[in-house]
Amino acid sequence: MKLLVKAPAKINLSLDVLGKRQDGYHEVKMIMTTIDLADRLELTELAEDRIEILSHNRYVPDDQRNLAYQAAKLLKEKFNVKKGVSITIEKTIPVAAGLAGGSSDAAATLRGLNKLWNLGLTIDELAELGAEIGSDVSFCVYGGTAIATGRGEKIEHIKTPPSCWVILAKPHIGVSTADVYGNLKLNRVTHPNVDKMVDVINSGDYKGICDTVGNVLEDVTFGMHPEVARIKSQMKRFGADAVLMSGSGPTVFGLVHHDSRMHRIYNGLKGFCEQVYAVRLLGERETLE
């Protein structure tokens, strides 16, 4: 039996770090929303008791480093599943980009295998399992738009922001999330107003959203990788309504309301950056139907 599952990327409209926890993680407060840039996974049930990862993308690991592999392994161990699965990952989301591509693949694997193996788990139970794999996996199980707290695994759903274009630009560099958090000095950064962002999203205020975007990690990544700051400057210069780095980077996104301006920004960035995408805010929550 085969099953096809979609794994959408996310962006952070607001990201704040409140402090370091005793378990080594950081306490965060952030707003994430899904976009219609997505990986596609094909799950094929195997009679043999093994997990196989296949992908044409050479940057996708085919072993336990892969979060989709970890998701399948977790379900097999928790629920004593003796069957195996082959997971083919068609990557569209850039790897190590601050867009939760790996986490979304893991979330899609949890949702898909819940059906394929008839486990009968609720979406809340899947999200709880997702937290054992990675901080963003719980959100990716649900999708939509949400406030994430704790280390990112506590999810509270809010309204979907008004529909708009999202221009993404990723420079040809990798950013270590651990290094970014390691260099973060909480008393020397500007903290975004996450609560205000919740208010303007819930009231459908597009201009308010554009005025309130913020990411406490931006200046840290900019200091480590000045080319990320240059992309942000270019996107602003081309006329995006709001520009922000997603996650710990290096991807920068711009919000754009008008089609003509979207095309102008997209074409301008194509001459400046190798990986550029024009997508829409998705905002739809996943279901198990």
UniProtKB/Swiss-Prot annotation:
It comes from the Bacteria. It is an enzyme of class 2 (transferase). Keywords: ATP-binding, Isoprene biosynthesis, Kinase, Nucleotide-binding, Transferase. The keyword Nucleotide-binding applies. InterPro entries: GHMP_kinase_C_dom (IPR013750), GHMP_kinase_C_sf (IPR036554), GHMP_kinase_N_dom (IPR006204), IspE (IPR004424), Ribosomal_Su5_D2-typ_SF (IPR020568), Ribsml_uS5_D2-typ_fold_subgr (IPR014721). Belongs to the GHMP kinase family. IspE subfamily. NCBIfam families: ispE, PRK14608.1. This is 4-diphosphocytidyl-2-C-methyl-D-erythritol kinase. It comes from Bacillus cereus (strain ATCC 14579 / DSM 31 / CCUG 7414 / JCM 2152 / NBRC 15305 / NCIMB 9373 / NCTC 2599 / NRRL B-3711).
